């Protein structure tokens, strides 16, 4: 997918990531862990799952990414959705979110979830804020071993793709 980034002359390409993107993805995620926006991911983990990511590329630079990981046959999670600080506010996150939703639809995944500090873009895309226990596959797989489990300040959001009418424009 190719888009025109808002408030810039750059052409933005959203594409599936490759192993060659892993280091750039890792560096982008790591720069946001320090700010408390994302959970830490190891380079090895990002390399192992690089093909589950979508990459936003502008001027041959990775400026955003997001991962779609299947938690069960019924639920997939959007993880590590992040845009480079200097590129925020240009619609890049919305384009990445659209690509991840489209991929979930293509894979016939009935439900998407995410845990986020910033629920607004998800809600604008049709997600609903829900209590954490409503996303039990995520809790069972990841949350119980997280050091923030008992004091998690992230919002749980879900999107029912069986009734979804369309990805954000």
Residue ranges and their predicted role:
Residues 29-62:
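Active-site rim helix/loop that mediates acceptor-substrate recognition in acyltransferases
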Residues 135-169:
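C-terminal "cap" of GNAT-fold acetyltransferases
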Residues 61, 84-95, 107, 124:
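Conserved glycine-rich acetyl-CoA-binding loop
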Residues 110, 116-142:
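Conserved active-site alpha-helix within GNAT-family acetyltransferase domains
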Residues 89-102, 114:
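Conserved acetyl-CoA-binding loop-helix of GNAT-fold acetyltransferases
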Residues 12-25:
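A short beta-loop-alpha structural element at the N-terminal edge
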């Amino acid at each position: 997918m190719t888009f025109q980034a808002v408030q810039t002359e750059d052409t933005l390409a959203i594409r599936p990531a490759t192993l060659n993107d892993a280091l750039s993805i890792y560096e982008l995620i790591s720069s946001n862990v320090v700010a408390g926006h994302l959970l830490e991911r190891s380079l090895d983990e990002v390399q192992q799952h690089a093909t589950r990511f979508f990459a936003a590329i502008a001027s041959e630079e990775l400026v955003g990414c997001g991962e779609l990981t299947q938690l069960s046959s019924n639920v997939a999670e959007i993880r590590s959705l992040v845009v480079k600080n200097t590129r925020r506010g240009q619609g890049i996150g919305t384009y990445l979110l659209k690509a991840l939703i489209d991929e979930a639809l293509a894979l016939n995944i009935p439900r998407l979830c995410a845990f986020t500090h910033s629920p607004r873009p998800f809600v604008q895309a049709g997600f609903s804020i829900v209590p954490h226990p409503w996303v039990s596959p995520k809790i069972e797989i990841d949350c119980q071993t997280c050091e923030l489990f008992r004091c998690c300040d992230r919002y749980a959001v879900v999107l029912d793709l069986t009734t979804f009418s369309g990805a954000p424009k």
